[in-house]
Amino acid sequence: MRAFCLVGLVILASISTTLATKGIDLSASFNNFSCVKNAGYSFAIVRGYKSYGEVDTVGHQNLKNAKAAGLIGDAYFFPCKGKKTASAQVTEFDNVFGSEYGTVWIDVESNPSTGCGWSSSDHTGNCQFLQDIVNAFTAKKRLVGIYASQYQWSTIMGSASSCAKFTSHPLWYAHYDNNPSFSDYPKYALGGWTTPSIKQYVGDTTLCSVGVDLNFY
């Protein structure tokens, strides 16, 4: 019986990995998404808004190219806290992208752009700024998710458990263990989410001659 159970667990793990839906995210200009699809990937998340406060028109074209190749297309939004209001940034993005994507993922990580960084001390203000962005998108009837890692969330919001206001929205979390599985999430949980929706499990790799991160759900 013990041997049977062990074999069963191995089979179930194999099935789970086989059934995983894999995708990429990228920021570089790219037009060979058919190569990505043929490599076994089903979705692409393109950069839609740049860290210094500007719509990514390259990302918009990437989205069109990805969908034309038969991939599911989402966008990620790297907000600038400081130069423009949350509402202004969302409006700029929405004027270009409209409803062409499935979900827009708000990128919560350190921002290197001058005048656009999250506050190092006002964690409550950081949480409110994220709330303002989410509110602006939901007011436009867009589907919104959050992208973060436990480390980045803790740094920006004050702790891993802080700013637990967004659990009604899907979570895309990053943990680079080269394992397309959510089994690690309890150790790397953040923001009050008990269940993630997407995992970024490989960062800064190359696929079809373009720089990407690898994801699964």
Residue ranges and their predicted role:
Residues 2-20:
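Cleavable N-terminal signal peptides of Sec/SRP-targeted secreted and luminal proteins
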Residues 113-115, 153-156:
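Short catalytic/ligand-binding loop motif for oxyanion handling, primarily in non-cytosolic enzymes
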Residues 103-105, 155-159, 164-171:
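Accessory recognition modules or surfaces
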Residues 19-27, 35, 164-217:
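Functionally critical loop-and-helix segments that line ligand-binding/catalytic clefts
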Residues 86-94, 154-163:
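Distinct, well-ordered alpha-helical segments
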Residues 19-142:
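Substrate-binding cleft of extracellular glycoside hydrolase catalytic domains
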Residues 137, 141-155:
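Aromatic-lined carbohydrate-recognition surfaces of secreted/lumenal glycan-active proteins
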